[in-house]
Amino acid sequence: MSTTIDNLDGGVEVGEVGEVGEETSLYFNSFNWKELKRENNRDNVEMWCNIHDGEEHTFEELASFYAVCIRDQFVEMKYNYRDLKLHKITFIAKSKYGLYDSLIPQHNHNHGNNLQQTFLFHSNGLENPYFEENIIKFSRESINLVRYYFEIYYGNSKYLKNWSILGDSDEYYCKMAKFK
């Protein structure tokens, strides 16, 4: 999988992976996140992901796959698709408060019990596409999936630190250490 971020203010261009065929796009137009004060706050920043497996999926299946981790995070969703023979999905969301952290679900073919193994979080900064002390907000449903993913992928959770509950009890924030 290859991705390229160009011009966060004006849009996102995603690098192609071999023959990508028709693009399938899901547009999430606004977040329901609480404001986090940050330096260099931006108003229109995209959040995106790719899935590349070349297999057929229904839109409902794809939407359900995403919803596991982003449930209740979006106020409005619009979508279009041309080809359910999935070569590539571009997942775009504009952050209401200018956060520029991103989520890539790494697709597997089990949409049930092992789904927690499929998530990888990263920062889509202009220069360094790795964690660099970024703050990311997760729902209660997703927080254990993230922790479990790091445990099975890296062998432990040393890359996750400063877990805390801020504000409402069902909202979690995580400060992630820089890694490559």
From Swiss-Prot:
<protein>
    <recommendedName>
        <fullName>Uncharacterized protein DDB_G0283689</fullName>
    </recommendedName>
</protein>
